[in-house]
Amino acid sequence: MAEAAGDAGPGPGPGPAQEGAELAAVIGATVPTGFEQTAAEEVQEKLGSASRISRDRGKIYFAVPARSLPQVHRLRSVDNLFVVVEEFKDYQFKENKEDALKDLEDLVKKLPWTDPLKVWELNNSLKKKKTKRKKHSSQSPASREKLNDGGEERGADQKDTNDQEDCAQNIAGVEPAGSQDTEKPQGMASQNGGEEDEEDNEQLDARDEVQANSGSGTKAGDGQTAEEEAKVLKFRVTCNRAGDKHSFTSNEAARDFGGAVQEHFQWKADMTNFDVEVLLNIHNNEVVVGIALTEESLHRRNITHFGPTTLRSTLAYGMLRLCDPQPTDIIVDPMCGTGAIPIEGAAEWPCCYHIAGDNNPQAVKRAANNICSLLRKNESKDSSTALGVPLDVIQWDICNLPLRTGSVDIVVTDMPFGKRIGSKKKNWDLYPACLMEMGRICTPGTGRAVLLTQDKKCFAKALSRVGHIWRRAQTVWVNVGGLHAAVYLLRRTWERAEERRPFW
């Protein structure tokens, strides 16, 4: 990956949206590698749009009206979003490096920038409005008046720390009274009764913006004066290249393409404090030019307290969707770590009951604090009453779970890889014991398990030892932090699991 930027004088930004026009966009989304089909199914289900899976793994493309941008940002399976300017499925690169780079420069003025920039501008305005709404309702009436012992208002950091400690001690019974410590990632909505209202408001905002004369592009920041907003936009070009038959590097492509963008728009380049990020994605002979719609990955939406191996929320969603949760299902993550899987499950499948557990007290504490943050997201706007989530966390031993035999519908967990946590040697004893205990608590015939591991050899051996309890139904190959891992979907057989001594 490479980025390029340059300097330029003032110039025009993207033009206004035409009044009454129905603006459409082709959206590109990066998704966890291996879960492209899962993401496509979510897009079809929630947006009614068919998706095309890119030959470059980890990307999908779909067309939506621009007014649907709020729903696009609420997709659970996507990491980053961008609007496609143009796509070339079989771009012919010149063998000579100078000629190939010159072609990329000449490409800039031939691209249809107008509508994608309108979509970018609309996306920017929606982010600003959402930020203003969140700031306006970030504190409950009760917490606004709360003072400390010295008569002065408590600082936000101190309030947040106390709230998290209280919530971690009693997740089920304590309501967090403090204000929201971090803003939600753009486009996200809490899973409570107010979500529909917020969605309606965002839809109206989007429709108004599409139909309004919004003027030239503005800078994505708060406290900007009208004079500052009228200044030239700042930009950078990011090049992602894959393939060994190119005569140029990613840096060279980004540099020359960025120079042409700068000359075409007369924008000013800034590598860090930019308004527009132009994407140049090259995969062998496939070239896609786009404009980024997300500033940071949406996979960070749920976690505020990270552990050594925190699972991405988007990958957690893909694992949960793989096991097809049904209403009233009991879903257990026996090695929850920071709680990424059960928190994602509670947010997206609130009609199920989720149980998280871990043998490490620090992991349990992190999970409890992350649940506390989720409760604050769900806090009612007009009172300090928090809406609960169908989720509990407990410290336990994975090989001796305090759950009744056959009482669980689904087990979903990220097993120790033996890299940062545990060891490859310990996995040879841990994996078979885990599978046996998971088989005991799962309902015979209908129970499912979705397990992520990079220690594939050890898992295959362990599964062969418990083949009378678990049957492998599907394997999804994924990339986790550069490691080639696998997600296994197992189905519980009708075979009765070995009973053990009662826990009580």
Q: Where are the language model's segments positioned?
A:
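Hydrophobic residues embedded in beta-strands of well-ordered beta-sheets
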Residues: 60, 286-287
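Short, charged/polar, Gly/Pro-enriched secondary-structure boundary elements
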Residues: 67-74, 296-299, 496-498
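SAM-dependent Rossmann-like transferase core, predominantly class I methyltransferases
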Residues: 288-324
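Conserved S-adenosyl-L-methionine
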Residues: 311-405, 410
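S-adenosylmethionine
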Residues: 363, 370-480, 484-486
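Core SAM-dependent methyltransferase catalytic element
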Residues: 480-504
